[in-house]
Amino acid sequence: MSQQAIGSLETKGFPPILAAADAMVKAGRITIVSYMRAGSARFAVNIRGDVSEVKTAMDAGIEAAKNTPGGTLETWVIIPRPHENVEAVFPIGFGPEVEQYRLSAEGTGSGRR
């Protein structure tokens, strides 16, 4: 099992997912690992990081999504230590496009923050 948590947040409308993503990266030392359109006007963002950092970031993202005019927070989940099978199948891994941000969040690199 992974030592890093996964957080997933889904909204109805683009502005609340954008606000949530921004709030999450500002609130916790996390990395956004994927963003997707989940259906008609529904969007999801997935984050990774230490359990406590993901919880802090998700709290900020939930509040930001709830407070965005015209948008709706649909659902969210935090999985503290996802099983490796989940990581192998779902788009929640650290791809090369987010490596600099992961290193910065973990304090081991000089990525942008």
From Swiss-Prot:
GO biological process, one term: carbon fixation
Database matches in InterPro entries: Bact_microcomp_CS, BMC_dom, BMC_shell, CcmK, CcmK-like_sf, CcmK/CsoS1_BMC
Phylogenetic placement of the source organism: Bacteria, Bacillati, Cyanobacteriota, Cyanophyceae, Synechococcales
Gene: ccmK4
PROSITE patterns (alphabetical): BMC_1, BMC_2
Role: One of the shell proteins of the carboxysome, a polyhedral inclusion where RuBisCO (ribulose bisphosphate carboxylase, rbcL-rbcS) is sequestered. Assembles into hexamers which make sheets that form the facets of the polyhedral carboxysome. The hexamer central pore probably regulates metabolite flux. A minor shell protein of the carboxysome, a polyhedral inclusion where RuBisCO (ribulose bisphosphate carboxylase, rbcL-rbcS) is sequestered. Hexamers form sheets that form the facets of the polyhedral carboxysome. The shell is 4.5 nm thick, as observed for CcmK proteins. In PCC 7942 there are several CcmK paralogs with presumably functional differences; replacing the central pore residues (34-37) with those of CcmK2 from this organism (Tyr-Glu-Lys-Ile) allows the bacterium to make carboxysomes, but the expression level is too low to know if the carboxysome is functional for CO(2) fixation.
Similarity field: Belongs to the bacterial microcompartments protein family. CcmK subfamily.
Name the UniProt record assigns to this protein: Carboxysome shell protein CcmK4
Organism expressing this protein natively: Synechococcus elongatus (strain ATCC 33912 / PCC 7942 / FACHB-805) (Anacystis nidulans R2)
Use case: Heterologous expression of 12 carboxysomal genes in E.coli (ccaA, ccmK2, ccmK3, ccmK4, ccmL, ccmM, ccmN, ccmO, ccmP, rbcL, rbcS, rbcX) leads to the formation of bodies that resemble carboxysomes, have densely packed paracrystalline arrays and RuBisCO activity. These structures open the door to generating carboxysomes in plant cells to increase their photosynthesis and productivity, as well as tailoring bacterial microcompartments to specific metabolic needs and molecule delivery. The absence of ccaA, ccmK3, ccmK4, ccmP and rbcX leads to less active RuBisCO.
Keyword DNA repair (UniProt): no
